[in-house]
Amino acid sequence: MIPRRSCWLILLLNLLNVQSLLDASWWSTVAQLSTALAGHNVKPVCELPGLSPGQAQVCELFKDHMPAVSIGAQNAIQECQRQFTGHRWNCSTHYSTGMLGPIHKMATREAAFTYAILSAGVTHEIGRRCKQGLLTSCGCSDETKPKNVPTDWSWGGCGDNVEYGYKFSRDFIDIREKEHDPKRNHDNGRSLMNRRNNEAGRKILKRHRKPKCKCHGVSGACNMKTCWMQLPSMEQVGKILRNKYDKAIRVQINDRGNLQLLADEATKERKTRALPTDLVFMDDSPDYCRFDRHSGTLGTEGRVCKRGSGGAEGCDSLCCGRGYNTYTQEVKSKCNCKFEWCCKVVCQTCNNVTQVDICK
Amino acid sequence: MMLFPVLYILFAFSVTNGYLEDSWAMFSSERPVGPKCVDIPSNLSICNGIEYTQMRLPNILEHETVSEAIHASKDWESLLRLNCHPDTQRFLCSLFAPVCLMQMDRLILPCKSLCMAVKQGCENRMANYGFPWPEMLSCEKFEDDDMCIKPMQPAKPPAGSSTTCTACSQVATYENLVDQFCRSHLVLKAKVIRDSPTHIRVRNGRSLKKGERRRGVSDVEIRLSSESDGSCPCNIPVKNQNEKLLVMASRQPDGKYLANLVLPWQKEKNFKRAIHQFQRLNCQSLGREIRESASRRPHYYEMRRHNTGRYQMF
């Protein structure tokens, strides 16, 4: 009797483990797509375990798009880390478990931010590659001239094709949230939240495009210009989404299976519905202080903090009251660089001794 | 009975192994797109002969592709051939095809002193043809520091010698010859005598000015340098006394001539083309013609690339 029970327990634990691995590795899979395409991996490109069946089909049909998906995701994660540098949650990748990209097992506002910026990153990179002529099925933007461009400037050039990027990103990323995957429990609320936040990221990219104008010719006053529509940079997108993150709206799933503002949320904000570009979440965030496999948090142990600072990166806040250790660090760097024609840069080497505070 | 736990443990381990294997391969994947080095193509003509071979994209003028930089640089080829300053190429090339150094991210900009030197030499001549110094070449945005491209150091002349006369160091490009023609009152194909350190004397010459064809000119004295007491070398490679030169000079307020250009007569294509043009050139409308020809060129940004196919999911 006792041996049988232990057998079943082990089996159950492994199944649960597989499910959480599959879920958490979704964006890790996206990041691996270009690796597979580069031939560093024997595994067939579109059979990576994190792709859903529908996504695998899209991958087969649009193989030349996959490097853009991968790079767009990587750029998004970099921008995410830049926005949250020094915060307890800093969009870190969980290298020790071999999985890449942020892991969000709970429907927190951090998950909302991550999904939105990843979706925006993919849209951005696809649109940019259309402009550069790197994808066979799309080219320059077809957009007409907006009204705020002076009439005597010409409208032409090659604009970023955000329309195409938007459609592809929506179809490729959201298809996963619509499918019923037998390998995982179907969580309708979480899927709706993910789709909502993905769409917010894409819409923010679309709404913040603006005309880019360039002078041409030997004109002195720059009165000859050609303009086209250009996407915002990922830095700008990160900044906008960061504001949305600070004002994220809590929702819940209602009886009819739709997302709905919480009652107290609606009363407090005096509005009955969220904007299409608002981020939404369903769960409270953990404090991100301790390593917790169950909730997928890394903790702040070993993080570099700033002594005496009152902000998020200050040691009192970042270390969650556990204190910090101070280490002396000697850094060699290049200094007093000079450019010599033609063509090299000559630098001296400087030694700098600094102190680094690290959370206990 | 003991066999089952072992099998399940192996299963879990192999799953973990698969993910670890995939994740490590990621580190060799394609890097995010950023500034990059590309070879300077030969049809980026303003940089032909420059001392470096790789340029950085995007460049300082925000051109994102090589073809965009090439297209925009063609407007400036004429300025370069005008030879209005010895550092023109270094300056223009540093903007259109900036030096690319793999080990560092920062842009190598031209020094403000380089920009000002080129502007001082070229601004007036551009203005003659209706082209004010453009905003995109404004010197305000450059700084003099240790990491910028400095003006060329002039070669130190030997003791007791002075620099070559400006008139004797001209280039025989079409643009320069036509420009000098329009600024000169006297344009001759002539045999000359160097009868003093500061002057040449026309021994036997023929005017090339419109309406003055075949008018013989002789015994005209032309000063070589505008500086008083200026004596400067004018080492025209003349094989013998009968070698013919192209001589251009301006009439000064005192009625005397100051040399603008002294070159040996050549059979080279651009030289002959310019000489042939002298008879039909209208100097009053030259500036307007140049501006209009510049405006007629199709602009890079109007050459759109349209969709090659329609987007369809299934």
Curated annotation (Swiss-Prot), chain A:
It holds the Pfam family wnt. InterPro entries: Wnt, Wnt_C, Wnt_CS. GO terms for cellular component: extracellular space. One of its GO terms (molecular function) is receptor ligand activity. Keywords: Developmental protein, Disulfide bond, Extracellular matrix, Glycoprotein, Lipoprotein, Neurogenesis, Secreted, Signal, Wnt signaling pathway. Residues 1-37 form the signal peptide. The keyword Disulfide bond applies. Its main location: secreted. Expressed in intestine, pharynx, anterior body wall muscle, vulva, some pharyngeal neurons and SMD head neurons. Expressed along the boundary between the intestine and muscle or hypodermis, but is also expressed in the hypodermis in cells including seam cells. Disulfide bonds join 80-91, 130-138, 140-158, 213-227, 215-222, 289-320, 305-315, 319-359, 335-350, 337-347, 342-343. Palmitoleoylation is required for efficient binding to frizzled receptors. Depalmitoleoylation leads to Wnt signaling pathway inhibition. Glycans are attached at residues 90, 352. The keyword Disulfide bond applies. One of its GO terms (biological process) is Wnt signaling pathway. It is found in: Secreted, Extracellular space, Extracellular matrix. Disruption phenotype: Anterior displacement of the nerve ring in L1 stage mutant animals. Defective ALM, BDU, CAN and QR neuroblast migration and irregular CP and CAN axon growth and guidance. Double knockout with cfz-2 results in enhanced CAN migration defects, but the same QR neuroblast migration defects as the single cfz-2 knockout alone. Double knockout with cwn-1 results in ALM, CAN and HSN migration defects. Triple knockout with cwn-1 and cfz-2 results in enhanced neuronal cell migratory defects. It comes from the Eukaryota. A lipid is attached at residue 219 (O-palmitoleoyl serine). Belongs to the Wnt family. Ligand for members of the frizzled family of seven transmembrane receptors. Probable developmental protein. May be a signaling molecule which affects the development of discrete regions of tissues. Is likely to signal over only few cell diameters. Involved in the correct positioning of the developing nerve ring and in axon guidance of SIA and SIB neurons, probably by binding to tyrosine kinase receptor cam-1. In addition, regulates the positioning of some head neuronal cells, muscle arms associated with the nerve ring and the excretory pore. This is Protein Wnt-2.
